[in-house]
Each structure stands twice: as C-alpha cells, then as structure tokens.
Amino acid sequence: MENLLNYVRLRRDIDFSVRPFNEVDMLVCADLSYVDWDGIVEKEEVSLEEACRKYLSLYSEKELKSKYTFSINLPHLIDALQDTIRYGNIKLKNYKKVYSDEDVIQFSVVTLVLPDGSLVLSFSGTDGSITGWKENLMMTYSKDLPCQILAKDYVKETIADIPETSYLFGLKKKKVYPKMYLTGHSKGGNLAMYAYLKNPKLQGYIEGVKSFDGPGFADGFWQGDEDVSKITNYIPKDSIVGRVLDHREQTKVLDAEGSGLVQHDTLMWSVDIKDFNYCDALTKESDDLLEYVNKLLMDRPLEEKERYCHLIGELFDRMEIYTIADLTEFSFKQALSGIKEIRQLNAEEIKFMFEVVKFIAVQSAPILVKGRK
C-alpha cells in the first residue's frame, strides 16, 4: 500500500502546475503543524526546505523518536520534504505555540503559503503530553476551550493582516484576499472546524476546511443554522477519534492499514497518485469502538462526564504521569500513588478509571512499541 511518505517521495519532482495541489498535499500541510517550529518559523516567511533542514539539524534520531511518540514517521516526512520540486516553493510563516499545564492548553498553528499565493492555516492535533489528552477530555463537555478560542482568533488575525495592494498607478489601495484553507489532524481538525464556524462573517474568505480524523463538538454546540458546506472530515475506516462527539460536516471514509487507534496515524492511510483510496463504509471495529466509548463516557450526563474527566486528570497528576508513553513504564512509587488515589473513589468510579486506562493502554500499545523499535 502506498502511504503519505511514499507519495511525497514519488511525487517530489512533479510540481503543482503539472499535478495540482490536492487533498493528499493538504494532509502533508496538516501533519507539518505537529512540528515544533519554535525559533525556526516566526512571523516572516521561510522556505519549507530551509525550515526542515534547520529543524533536523537540531535533534538526533533518538531525540526525534522521543518527541514524536504518536507520529514516529513524522521525522521521515520532514526529511523527505527537504529537497523537492513539488514542495520546494512552499513558505512557512506565523508559527504560534501556546502550552500551559496549569490552564490545560496545548496549541500550535502554522501558516503555509503555496506557490500560487494561497494560504493554508494548519492547526496541530494532540501531542504525547497528558496536558493535550486532558484537553481532549475537556472537549467532551466544554463548548469553548482556550485552544479553540486561540484558533478562532488566529484566523481572524490572519485575515486582518492581509496587506493592501496598490492599483491605479499607486493612487488607490485595496486588499486582495488569497484563497485560504483551514486544516488539521485529530484535535487540529476540530480547531479548524471551530475557527471557521465561530467566524461566520469571515467564512466568505475561506475556500474550504479539511479535517483529518477530527472529533466533533460537545452537546449544545450546534445551533442548527451553521453552514457546513465547505467542511469535510476525512476518516480512516476504523476511525474512532473522527466519530466521537457531535458531527454535522460531510465525511469521507479512507482505506487504511492496521486496526483501531493505529489508523489514527496518517501514515497508515492509503493514497494513490493524486488522491486517497476511499471506502464505501466504516468497519464493524469502528462501530464497536464507538459504542464502547459512548457507553464509557460520551453518553453520560454533562456534569457526570465533567467529574469523571477530572478524576482521570487527577489520577495522572498524582501518579506523575506526564506523557502517554509513561502509562506503559511507570514505577512502583507511581503505581502506589495511583492505588492511594483510587482507594478514595467509589466502586463505579474505580471501574470507570480502570476501563479508561485499559482502553488507552491497549489502543496505544502497538504505536508505542513500534516507536521504541
């Protein structure tokens, strides 16, 4: 099966004038938001090639593996983008990163400038930090998270900052707005959708919103009059992340390798020379996983959902678990702290906690083991 990495390597000499920018190229843009461009990409434009080269020079292979626990092939993608005709003229700018354990924020975004001047605003999904996963849990009961507000404001600021262009021999000026797309994978897809939906007066400036296996929204978010005609969510056939919470956008199902949460990795998705390989329907495993997650958490009343999500966060804090990888490698001291915390809970809460930890560990194990090889 050809995947995204193969696609980039095999199409490296074919520029966009020969084979136009497509959904697979958009996924490349979405994945680039996971890269920590801090100190490399700032307000001014820098070429994608140069940014990739600088980034790879900062870290050893071992360091890159530890940074991208859930995106183990991302360093290979960055390497493949260093010297290509297809992506050589793409520029990066306006990288923004906000991280706070205290406020539970894990947010980053970067703007890509395509050769034709189009802008792609790419929002990052969840990294391997527990803070990022706490943020995901908050999405199940909160309608306006700090990361979502940051995404909305970033779009508003980007449109406001479009420079004026002179015409009539310089006597007059006006803004010429380029085509603009919003994209992101996982939570990043949710942020792209949120930023579009919460900027109704700016939707005319946005050509399309491409979410890649992005979750939906908490109960009560949708008001019924939103325009979702420009939003598409691409989800793998075993999808769980891209199906949870409330969705109204159109969905396209992709063929993919692996099973369960493994398919959340975009490098597991099947592509051909100019598009994804699509499926007619989702799998039974996807339906079963969704039913399990809904029974475990999503179908609970709002207040109960919020309380249970707080319990998970408190358990991880007490056990000093800071990354998802820590779940498979915690010490006896951490386990003891967890037991002490759990002993304070009632029987139903204890059962819930074990089910959540088991689900995360079982679904994450194939990814984490692969990343350590």
Residue ranges and their predicted role:
Residues K43-E44:
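Charged, often low-complexity linker/regulatory segments
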Residues L92:
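Active-site-adjacent helix-turn-beta-strand microarchitecture at beta-sheet edges
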